[in-house]
Amino acid sequence: AQRVDELENVNIRTTTCPFPPKTVLADPERKHFIYNDYHMSAASRKLHDKDLCNYVPLTYHEGPSFYERDYVAADVALIKVAPMDKHGFFNLGTALSLTPLFCDTAKTVIVEVNENVPICLGGCRESIHISEVDYIVEGDNQPMIQLPELPIADTDKKIAAIVLEEIEDGACLQLGIGAMPNAVGAMIAQSDLKDLGVHTEMLVDSFVDMYEAGRITGRRKQLDKCKMAYTFAMGTNKLYNFLDGNPACAIY
C-alpha cells in the first residue's frame, strides 16, 4: 500500500479477509491494485458493492484443481509465518488450507516472519522449509487478527437450544463463524455431553471453552482420534494461545 504510486495492475488474491486490505484503502479508484476474494467476508461484500473487490466464484473443494491446472498462476505467494525453528522450518500458522499449494505453484515465495503467529501442529505440511523460500521479510510483529465477540441474541439462543437437543455423546462437531455457532458452543460447554470430537473447517474460541470444560476428547473419532482437526482458525488471543504447540489440535 505504501508503494501505491509505483505499481500498476497488481492482482491481489485472498479469501475471507475480515477487514478491508490496506491496498484497497490506498487505491480507492482501482488504478493500481485489483483485489479479488474467493470467499467473501462482510468486509469484502461491502467493497464489492463499491466496485472495489472482485468475487471469484470457487467452491472450496475446487481450490486444488484451480491452482494445479494453472487457471490462476501466481507470480508471488506472500505468507505470514512463525519464526524459523532449529530444523529450518517456518510454521504456517493458523491458516493451512491451500497455503502449501500456493507455495508450490507460485513463481516466488516470500515469507513474513511474525513472532505472534502460533505454532499450529498438523497432519500434513504445516511448515515450509527455508530451502523452499525465495525471500524472508522480518516484519514488525503485528498482532494476530482479533475477531470481536458478537452479541448473542435471543433468536440465536433459541436456535442453539434446538441444535443442542440433536447432539449425542461422541458426536463430531463443526462450527462456523457468528453469534449462533458461539451460542451453540457455549451451551455445549455448560452441558453434560461427553467425548465429543471436532472435525471442522474453522476453529473458533468456543472450541476452547468446550475443550476446557471437558466436553471435547475426540476419543470416539475414527479419523484423527483424540485430535481437533481443522483447516484454519480465527478468533482472539484465547484461541491462538490455546493452539500454540498444542498436540490436541491438527491443522490440515
Predicted regions and their residues:
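Conserved alpha/beta enzyme-core scaffold
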Residues: 1-252
